[in-house]
């Protein structure tokens, strides 16, 4: 889009004026020249909107030169931009060529982003639709797939499906502690490995200490 810079700046001007938060689906492709994420990072800094801008996908970061990626990641951390990686969607759609085994994963560099201080979220944006019929909103299943695809240590990335998404939406999430609100999901299993090995295991959802639902896919 030849007018992308102008349009993005207009969006930021309105968001800053009306104190809105912004969410972008950006650079969802494997073209190395795709760099709208960079512009969003610059505008976030320019309009002092740290903590109010969330981007999704940024698949092109996986194929751009390493030095470019390092620079934009550092700038994103300084600007306060968060990034959602959509592992199942990106793995399915990127480098998807009929009859050819994919060689590119299309996943944004999660380890590097996190190491630089960029809040990383995990999510899914294609659920039982023509783009990805096997998609699910189940956050635990998303974490499981991301752990396999990006070699994550699952227990260390729990914030990617809990606190980081909450903060990106401007919400607080209570910790489990004495005197805190007893809002949590109890998953059947003896360890993280059990929970991820059987993502459809029985769950119980608690709100203020009371059971809200019991089932294999409680939400």
Model features per residue range: what roles?
Residues 1-54, 60-82, 99-122:
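Histidine/acidic residue-rich metal-binding segments in metalloenzymes
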Residues 27-28, 88-89, 125-127:
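Short, ordered loop/turn segments at secondary-structure junctions
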Residues 34, 65-68, 95-97, 132-135, ...:
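Short, well-ordered secondary-structure micro-motifs
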Residues 42-53, 93, 104-189:
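His/Asp/Glu-enriched, well-ordered alpha-helical/loop segment
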Residues 56, 85-86, 123, 129-130, ...:
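Thr-Gly-centered strand-to-loop micro-motif
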Residues 61-63, 91, 128, 192-193, ...:
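Surface-exposed, flexible loop/turn segments at secondary-structure boundaries
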